[in-house]
Regions:
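Conserved alpha/beta-hydrolase "nucleophile elbow" surrounding the catalytic nucleophile
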Residues: 1-6, 126
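Flexible "cap/lid" loop of the alpha/beta hydrolase fold
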Residues: 14-15, 21-52
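Conserved alpha/beta-hydrolase catalytic His-Asp/Glu region
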Residues: 56-108, 112-113
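Core-facing hydrophobic residues within beta-strands of well-ordered domains
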Residues: 20-21, 147
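Catalytic active-site module of serine/aspartate enzymes centered on a nucleophile-bearing elbow/loop
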Residues: 146-177
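Conserved alpha/beta-hydrolase "acid-adjacent" motif
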Residues: 130-136
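Short beta-strand/loop motif that positions the catalytic acidic residue
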Residues: 117, 123-125, 129
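Hydrolases whose catalytic domains are alpha/beta-hydrolase-1, hotdog thioesterase
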Residues: 8-12
Length: 177
């Protein structure tokens, strides 16, 4: 699961482990994780910056502001437009608000006992995630017994999109192992 989807994936792995053969958590963190409850203020400021600069907010939310990060943001947004038919619609404003509310609530929860997750787990993130701070990926890894951690350099919340080819190769190898 990516981001909020990673929260859901952790819940499933804890509550119905028989349904999960392998777990991949990206750009996510544990309940009560450091800084997760700050997503509201981080997101709004960067969404406003996107409006002011006439740029997609993903430039600021998912990628670093280095030349490498911005090049990756351009490439990612271009890839998103490649699919011409049956494209998913973006979230409505009310759905986006509900997502932020759910992420904030997750960040304020009591931590769960992730040592109960016995499923082999691949955890990936960028080294500069400002939405779900990177320290939370390391925190998950320390608490889940069977884990592999990938932290991409000069990458943010969208690290798996920035280094997509490398991530897919590693994810497939993990799933095949």
């Amino acid at each position: 699961g990516f981001s909020l989807g990673g929260f859901v994936a952790q819940e499933i792995a804890l509550k119905a482990p028989e349904l999960v053969r392998k777990l991949i958590l990206t750009g996510t963190g544990p309940a009560g994780g450091q800084g997760i409850d700050k997503v509201w203020s981080v997101s709004w400021l960067l969404m406003l910056k996107g409006l002011i600069t006439f740029r997609d907010p993903k430039f600021y939310l998912f990628f670093t502001q280095s030349a490498n990060g911005q090049k990756a943001a351009h490439a990612f947004l271009k890839r998103l437009k490649e699919r011409k038919k049956e494209r998913d619609k973006g979230p409505t404003p009310s759905a986006f608000l509900r997502q932020l509310k759910a992420i904030t609530a997750w960040g304020r929860q009591m931590p769960q006992d992730l040592s109960l997750i016995k499923t082999p787990t691949l955890i990936a993130n960028g080294d500069s995630d400002i939405m779900v701070p990177t320290v939370n990926s390391s925190g998950c890894a320390r608490r889940i017994p069977d884990w592999k951690l990938i932290i991409d350099e000069d990458a943010g919340h969208g690290g798996i999109f920035q280094y997509h080819a490398d991530f897919v190769t590693k994810a497939l190898a993990f799933l095949d192992s």
